[in-house]
Design a protein with these regions (language model features):
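Tandem repeat scaffolds
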Residues: 2-12, 17-224
Length: 224
C-alpha cells in the first residue's frame, strides 16, 4: 500500500492507494510543538510519498523512512535526526537548514538538489547519490559514505567543506568543482577525486584559489 502525504500549514492530507487506486483519503489537523514543528517522530512512514510546494518545520526524529519519496520545490527547517532513510529519494529543488544528524540508511538520492546549510554529521549514508548537487555551508564530519557518488557536484561554500574523520572508502568525487575542503583523519581507501578546474579561468583571486586547493589536498591522508 502506498501513502501519498501532502503537508500544508497545520494540515496533513493522506491518500491510501492499493493497486494504483485510491482506497481512502483522510485529513489530519496536526498540533505544533513549542518550536512550531509538526511532529512526525517515531513513526513508521515506509513507502510514503510526501508532496507539497514547500515542506517546512517538520520533525522526523527516529522515524522509519524506508522507500520514501519527497517531491516538492523545497524542504526547509526539517529534522531527520536518527531517522532510518533506506532508499529515500529527494526530488526537490533545494534543501535548506535541514538536519540529518545520526541518520542511517543506504541508497539515498539527493541528485541535482541544492544542499544549503545541511548537517550530515555522524550519519551513515552508504551507496548514496549526490550527483550534480550544489553544496553550500554543509557538514559531512564523521560520516560513513561508503561508495557514494559526488559526480559533477559543486561545493560553493565560502568556508571549507568538512569531511573530518569520515569514512570515504570507494567514494567518487568525479569532476567536482571544489576549491576548499578538509579531509583530515578520513578513511580514503579507493577514493577517487578529480577536480574541474574551469573556475580558474577568469578567477580574480587566482593565487588564493590555487592555494586553497593545495591546502585541501594537503589534508588528505598519505595513502589517499
Amino acid at each position: 500500500m502506498l501513502r501519498e502525504v501532502s503537508i500544508s500549514n497545520d494540515t496533513i492530507s493522506v491518500k491510501f492507494y492499493r493497486n494504483e487506486k485510491i482506497e481512502c483519503a483522510c485529513n489530519f489537523l496536526m498540533d505544533k510543538d513549542a518550536q512550531g514543528y509538526i511532529d512526525l517522530s517515531d513513526l513508521d512512514l515506509t513507502s510514503c510519498h510526501f508532496k507539497g510546494d514547500v515542506i517546512s518545520k517538520v520533525s522526523f526524529l527516529s522515524s522509519n523512512l524506508q522507500h520514501v519519496t519527497f517531491e516538492c520545490k523545497e524542504i526547509e527547517n526539517c529534522n531527520f535526526t536518527k531517522a532510518t532513510v533506506d532508499n529515500v529519494i529527494f526530488k526537490c529543488r533545494r534543501l535548506h537548514n535541514v538536519i540529518f544528524l545520526k541518520t542511517s540508511g543506504e541508497c539515498v538520492d539527493f541528485s541535482q538538489n541544492i544542499l544549503d546549510t545541511v548537517d550530515f554529521s555522524q550519519s551513515q549514508l552508504g551507496h548514496s547519490n549526490f550527483r550534480e548537487c550544489q553544496i553550500r555551508n554543509s557538514n559531512f564530519d564523521n560520516c560513513y559514505l561508503y561508495a557514494s557518488h559526488f559526480t559533477r557536484a559543486e561545493f560553493l561554500s565560502a568556508k571549507e567543506i568538512s569531511f573530518i574523520k569520515s569514512n570515504l572508502t570507494a567514494v567518487m568525487f568525479d569532476h567536482v568543482r571544489m576549491s576548499t575542503g578538509n579531509f583530515k583523519d578520513c578513511i580514503t581507501e579507493q577514493l577517487e577525486l578529480t577536480i574541474d578546474y574551469s573556475d580558474v579561468f577568469g578567477n580574480e583571486d587566482l593565487d588564493g584559489y590555487i592555494n586553497n586547493i593545495i591546502k585541501m589536498i594537503d589534508t588528505l591522508p598519505d595513502n589517499a
